[in-house]
Regions:
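RNA-binding accessory domains that recognize and position tRNA/RNA substrates
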Residues: 1-53, 57-63, 67-68, 73-75, ...
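Extended catalytic-interface subdomain
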Residues: 323-325
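Gly/Ala-rich beta-loop-alpha elbow adjacent to hydrolase catalytic centers
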Residues: 81, 85, 90
Length: 513
């Protein structure tokens, strides 16, 4: 999509780089995250108004530490360095960076002075969040110090002649209360951004671009019933109407009543026509005897492609594939070490187009999840879709430890439905970001009436998170957990023991496989 202005964020590996982009976009300022290896030709484009250098876990004084294209310092573009990014600026302009004796971690209060363009409206004191070991020992010309911490550390600096700034703290996190104001000052006061980015303008532009690209061709979209694929279908459908075919493949690995719910929800939307294919027998046959998690994922991915390809080739005039790729999918598929080293191959990035020889449409690839949700609301999607908990691509197969069978899926479906039902009744479903049940390959002794039982154990999992990069377990009330455990043990055949997972991420992941 074409943009008249943007801020480029160079990623040096910080866990909160995406927060910088989200804060700016919340202000209506479009921005993109690029790996630090990006060349100046890709950064200094006509629409680029400024550059942000993110934080990162490395030390600028270590050999081989990540550095940007040196030409960006001579580009004339405004630059704003955060933590590691500030140290890069200091090092480049001759201000020595040294290891700290103990570093600064957590809340701090800094004193502001100097350059009014970035400090505008922030007063002379600011509460911030520090997280650094190294620091700039002494600011040298042509830089000048514009803020200091109570520990005597350089908290911010600026170039005397150029629009180059750095802060040692993290303005993007909520622990820096006025951080968003600081980022706005840089983007608006220094870079001259006008802030015209909105979801209304995005939808209008996306519809025009989809129509222009597709013409009279037909488009197929793999719809899972989740937020991303459903918004994709609704957006493409708004652009081209009945030229779009949404294909839902029933793998047999979905949640209880999922197929019926998706058919009902999507069939009622004016821009979406749904074609449902029941391929559950095929998936269970391929998964028979398989217990290793990665093998399950590969089998499910391969089988899905085979089914999708079979159905797509049976349709006349289909030339395009619409995918629900969103911006975090794109970011996660490119490492901060550059294109040669991927963090992971995301299921939404690549795969199907090469096999199907279809042209790819990814209308949401510039959007974060919260922006995708806003687009869905503008397109008239119901809250049951907009605020549904995330569900993994391989479905229940990665929530069943061990072999995946139809019987075990039915058992897990029933237990999961009870958990979600009780969360909704108690008003907790919307308070937690994700909740589900895991079926263990473990049996436990129990008592039912006068009979001894020897049946499966399951795990309840509920987490709180802003971005799923880190997560903490939800502190559900004990009486709620007790009701869930009692209902599962009494109503679900094959389960006699219920546990609750209280592990955070890290060290654990949200899903068990």
């Amino acid at each position: 999509m074409k943009h008249t202005e943007r801020i480029v964020i160079l990623d040096f590996g910080s866990q909160v780089t995406q927060l910088i982009a989200r804060r700016l976009r919340e202000m209506g300022i479009y921005c993109e995250i690029l790996p630090f290896t990006a060349r100046i030709a890709d950064i200094q484009t006509p629409e680029t108004k400024g550059i942000v250098l993110s934080g990162g876990p490395a030390s600028v004084i270590e050999e081989g530490s990540p550095h940007p294209d040196e030409a960006l310092y001579e580009s004339g573009l405004p630059i704003f360095g955060i933590c590691y990014g500030m140290q890069l600026i200091g090092q480049h302009y001759g201000s020595p960076v040294v290891p700290g004796s103990q570093g600064e971690y957590g809340p701090a209060t800094i004193s502001l002075h100097g350059d009014g363009s970035v400090w505008s409206g922030l007063g002379d004191k600011m509460d911030v969040w520090m997280s650094h070991g190294d620091h700039i020992e002494q600011v040298q010309e042509p830089l000048t110090q514009i803020a200091g911490s109570s520990a005597g550390i350089v908290a911010a600096l600026a170039h005397r002649e150029r629009r180059v700034y750095g802060v040692q703290f993290h303005p993007e996190v909520t622990h820096t209360p006025r951080g968003a104001d600081l980022l706005r000052n840089f983007a608006v006061n220094v870079c001259g951004c006008t802030g015209g980015w909105s979801m209304e303008s995005f939808v209008e532009q996306a519809v025009k671009e989809i129509r222009a690209a597709v013409g009279k061709s037909r488009v197929i979209c793999a719809t899972s019933g989740g937020l991303d694929s459903t918004v994709t279908a609704a957006l493409v459908g708004k652009a081209i109407g009945r030229q779009l075919i949404s294909l839902y493949v029933d793998t047999g690995l979905g949640r209880k009543g999922e197929r019926e719910e998706i058919e009902e929800l999507l069939a009622g939307h004016e821009h979406i026509q749904v074609r449902v294919v029941d391929a559950s027998e095929e998936f269970f046959r391929e998964l028979k005897g398989v217990t290793e998690p990665e093998c399950k994922r590969k089998i499910i991915g391969r089988t899905f492609i085979e089914v999708f390809q079979r159905e797509a080739t049976a349709l006349d005039g289909v030339e395009y594939l619409a995918q629900g790729t969103i911006y975090p999918d794109v970011i996660e598929s490119v490492s901060v070490r550059g294109p040669s080293a991927t963090i992971k191959s995301h299921h939404n990035v690549g795969g199907l187009p090469e096999t199907l020889h279809l042209k790819l449409i990814e209308p949401l690839r510039e959007l974060f999840k919260d922006e995708t949700r806003k687009v869905g609301a503008l397109l008239g999607l119901p809250e049951t879709i907009l605020y549904r908990h995330p569900f993994p691509g391989p479905g229940l197969a990665v929530r069943i430890l061990g072999e995946v069978t139809r019987e075990r899926c039915d058992t897990l479906r029933d237990a999961d439905a009870i958990f979600i039902d009780e969360l909704r009744r108690a008003g907790w479903y919307a308070k937690t970001r994700q909740a589900f049940v895991v079926l263990l390959p473990v049996k436990a002794v129990g008592v039912m009436g006068d009979q001894r039982t020897y049946e499966n154990a399951c795990v309840l999992r509920a987490v709180d998170t802003d971005d799923f990069m880190t997560a903490d377990f939800t502190r559900l009330p004990f009486d709620l957990l007790s009701r869930v455990a009692s209902r599962i043990a009494n109503e679900v055949r094959g389960i006699n023991r219920v546990t609750y997972d209280i592990t955070s991420k890290p060290p654990a992941t949200v899903e068990w496989e």
